[in-house]
């Protein structure tokens, strides 16, 4: 069987991409080198923009069930929470959702939609030509080959599709390394002054340029991290032992606090790298395969998730033959600068969490700035991805920005705009206007749904004064209309983002 798309990697990015591709009708195979799902969680939360996207695909309730809401974001553990409340969103918070649960929910959805998932199958080589990609795979029963139109590497920063392509991964080497343990502790952990709301327990050692921090994962289970900033770099892939963590805890905090019942051990660094390009012919990269960084502010999983939602509809339309030729190139053009911004802010956070006394003035200044509403909002927008704006033709300030989940007044009552995106199609929304939009957009009705609303239930929304919006499947506005503009530019926008009209 020839697949439309083969995805290497069954983490959150690969699984969400599989969901998006199946909604577009693409025959999709996911290959995961690990034979079994892991039972630990590297990432622990989803930010506001990711929650919005989950709502748009009908997955929001599953993620929000029993998930604590974190209403104050974290920047460099400076103790001043980021305020999401000024954004036009139904979700001014992050959700505490362990990655294991995220992957469980996304796996179930991908399989429900018809994606095929093979665990214990690793991509080992690839060859591509103008017609497709031949993927060499090693599975439990030996090597074999798979034919596909496109291959997407969502397999992380290690031995990956990116390396098989020979795509460079430039960036910055680490100046910090840490050991991590998810465990129980028999002794009371010290309360960490100045460690921030996300790290209520800890010890700061300016003399050692090191710190210990911990926060609760579940009753009596904590994630403990010990970080050093003046030690030789330790290979991130090197195994970590309980004794490594005990020794680090004792050196920095004076005790291992009776650590026991260890669930997970790992290490992290502030290595920061980004792929030189996200595409090579019929092979693309997404998630950690094209960007890695210090996991500060919980941005990594969300960055990859949003890569998947940006890429999925574009690749699906390309396979269906409805996309304009240049549509797939907009994936890298839009997402690479966003990832570069995340690398930039995590590099800044890496400096701010370094307990070197020389940086104390910088930390004090940053704390003062975080109390300035405009600065706080700017950083909250960065961390949550609520401020993302893609390059878009036109001058209206909403162009290229996410559409808020508006409560629409319709003939059937009030309905949230997000519910019209469950099928991952474009939406042409009219707001109480009599413009001949339906006739003009009729030739795209196989790709774009017309939603006629009388207006918005909440006054003072971001779309006040507009009579219509064209919104891409990923929720970003690509055309607007006002009474004075009529339908000017609608056909061009439809062609740009949804291809030529149907014959």
From Swiss-Prot:
One of its GO terms (molecular function) is anhydrotetracycline monooxygenase activity. It comes from the Bacteria. Its cofactor is FAD. Gene3D superfamilies: 3.40.30.120, FAD/NAD(P)-binding domain. Pfam families: FAD_binding_3, Rng_hyd_C. The keyword NADP applies. It is an enzyme of class 1 (oxidoreductase). InterPro entries: FAD-bd, FAD/NAD-bd_sf, RIFMO-like. It catalyses: anhydrotetracycline + NADPH + O2 + H(+) = 5a,11a-dehydrotetracycline + NADP(+) + H2O. Disruption phenotype: Mutants fail to produce oxytetracyline but instead synthesize novel polyketides of shorter chain length. Its EC number is 1.14.13.38. Keywords: Antibiotic biosynthesis, FAD, Flavoprotein, NADP, Oxidoreductase. One of its GO terms (biological process) is antibiotic biosynthetic process. Pathway: Antibiotic biosynthesis; oxytetracycline biosynthesis. Belongs to the PheA/TfdB FAD monooxygenase family. PANTHER family: BINDING MONOOXYGENASE, PUTATIVE (JCVI)-RELATED, TRK SYSTEM POTASSIUM UPTAKE PROTEIN. This is Anhydrotetracycline monooxygenase. It comes from Streptomyces rimosus. The gene is otcC.
């Amino acid at each position: 069987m020839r697949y439309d798309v083969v995805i290497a990697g069954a983490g959150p990015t690969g699984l969400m991409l599989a969901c998006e591709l199946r909604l577009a009708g693409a025959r999709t195979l996911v290959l995961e080198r690990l034979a079994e799902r892991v039972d630990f969680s590297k990432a622990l939360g989803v930010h506001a923009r990711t929650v919005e996207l989950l709502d748009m695909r009908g997955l929001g309730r599953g993620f929000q069930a029993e998930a604590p809401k974190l209403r104050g974001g974290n920047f460099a553990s400076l103790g001043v929470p980021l305020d999401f409340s000024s954004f036009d969103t139904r979700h001014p918070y992050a959700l505490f959702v362990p990655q294991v649960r995220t992957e469980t929910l996304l796996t179930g959805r991908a399989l429900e939609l018809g994606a095929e998932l093979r665990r214990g199958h690793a991509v080992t080589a690839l060859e591509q030509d103008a017609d497709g990609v031949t993927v060499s795979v090693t599975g439990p029963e030996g090597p074999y080959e798979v034919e596909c139109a496109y291959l997407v590497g969502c397999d992380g920063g290690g031995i990956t599709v990116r390396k098989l392509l020979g795509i460079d991964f430039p960036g910055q080497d680490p100046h910090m390394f840490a050991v991590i343990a998810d465990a129980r502790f028999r002794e009371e952990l010290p309360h960490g002054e100045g460690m921030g709301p996300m790290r209520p327990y800890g010890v700061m050692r300016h003399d050692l340029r090191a710190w210990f921090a911990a926060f609760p994962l579940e009753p009596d289970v904590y994630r403990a991290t010990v970080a050093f900033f003046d030690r030789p770099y330790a290979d991130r892939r090197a195994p970590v032992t309980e004794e490594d963590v005990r020794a680090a805890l004792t050196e920095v905090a004076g005790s291992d606090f009776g650590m026991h019942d260890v669930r997970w051990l790992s290490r992290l660094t502030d290595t920061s790298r980004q792929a030189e390009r996200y595409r090579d012919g019929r092979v693309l990269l997404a998630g950690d395969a094209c960007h890695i960084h210090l996991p500060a502010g919980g941005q990594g999983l969300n960055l990859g998730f949003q890569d998947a939602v940006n890429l999925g509809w574009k690749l699906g339309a390309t396979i269906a033959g409805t996309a304009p030729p240049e549509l797939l190139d907009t994936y890298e053009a839009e997402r690479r600068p966003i990832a570069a911004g995340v690398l930039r802010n995590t590099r800044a956070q890496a400096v701010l969490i370094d307990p070197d006394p020389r940086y104390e003035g910088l930390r004090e200044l940053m704390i003062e700035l975080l109390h300035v509403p405009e600065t706080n909002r700017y950083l909250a927008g960065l961390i949550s991805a609520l401020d993302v704006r893609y390059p878009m033709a036109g001058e209206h300030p909403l162009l290229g920005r996410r559409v808020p989940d508006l409560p629409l007044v319709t003939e059937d009552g009030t309905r949230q705009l997000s519910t019209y995106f469950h099928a991952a199609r474009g939406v042409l929304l009219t707001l109480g206007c009599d413009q001949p939009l339906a006739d003009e957009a009729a030739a795209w009705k196989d790709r774009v749904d017309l939603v006629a609303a009388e207006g918005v239930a909440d006054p003072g929304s971001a779309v006040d004064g507009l009579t219509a919006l064209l919104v891409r499947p990923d929720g970003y506005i690509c055309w607007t209309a006002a009474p004075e503009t009529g339908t000017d530019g609608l056909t061009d926008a439809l062609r740009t983002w949804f291809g030529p009209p149907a014959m």
